[in-house]
Amino acid sequence: MPAWSDDKRDDPQPCRDADQGKFETTVRDGRARIGRIHTQHGVLETPALLPVINPNIRTIEPREMWDRYGIQGLITNSYIIWKHDDLKQHAVTKGVHDLLNFPGVVMTDSGTFQSYMYGDVEVGVEEIVEFQRLIGVDIATMLDVFSRPDMTEEEAEKAVQTTIDRSQASLDSAQGVMLNGPIQGGIYRHLRKASAQSMGCFDF
């Protein structure tokens, strides 16, 4: 990551088409890995800290994060963008990078947390992935089912299975866009293991 600077940083160069979506391991230590994810908005070095940006509330402007603090990528919420007409129109016509004024890697969440906080979201499993693709995100996230710490084992198991059941349709809707496959299971270790094993069978 570049040192803090008051100077404007150059925008990143897109990766080669053949490298799009590629994860490259550069250092390995046991099961730990350091690597690079190749995207159309630069190469993201991992592990990476991605600040979360609410498109309606910007404590620090995304462009300042890029220029001054050397942030390579950030996360924003596609459901918030989808739900607000002004944000949605801007993102659809000019892209999410223009909406946020951020040239680096943009990853989006799908509305799962909003579902946890406020009840069911108003968008479909395939629809929200298609929307993320439409607005040009680099890394999208499927609409999974959140596993709360206070869930019973039966409830957590249902969240695991529902997330698995939504996976293939979500991948089909992504049409080549990198897609996260979240792991569920809550406080139950055997469910987290089963979730990871099942989700690992898909092309996330």
Question: Residue ranges of each PLM-predicted region?
Answer:
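Non-catalytic, usually N-terminal nucleic-acid engagement modules in DNA/RNA processing proteins
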Residues: P2-Q175
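Glycine-rich phosphate/ribose-binding loops and adjacent secondary-structure elements
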Residues: P2-K8, Q161, S170-F204
